[in-house]
């Protein structure tokens, strides 16, 4: 039983590294330069979900299937905890989580063929999630670079450490 608890703790620690990496990416001030207002929780959450969708897209494989499912579960549990900390009640949290899950799955679907899309198609996809942002083309370039950088690193790299964008 000791070994099992230890391995669960280690895996949770690894998953928190991925969660924290995604949070760090979504806090990148450069992402918000074309926003004509103060950023808010919803903006940061949208960027978190977009980053996470690209992360899953890049590392999706049969051999990573189980661990990516655990990372997915862990990240959405962490999001739920964050929403609770803001002070929402249970019913409100359930509604919000359903909205966020639907948003996430829409993003996953929209970026599935990202590398095959033209720049204008990418602009259209991102702008549907980032309506208040002006210079979406900068964000398209950012996410192209982000995916390129993900492809240069292993999943294990993100499990082991927290990086700053």
Where on the chain are the PLM-derived regions?
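Surface/interface-facing alpha-helical segments and adjacent flexible terminal/loop regions used
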Residues: 1-165
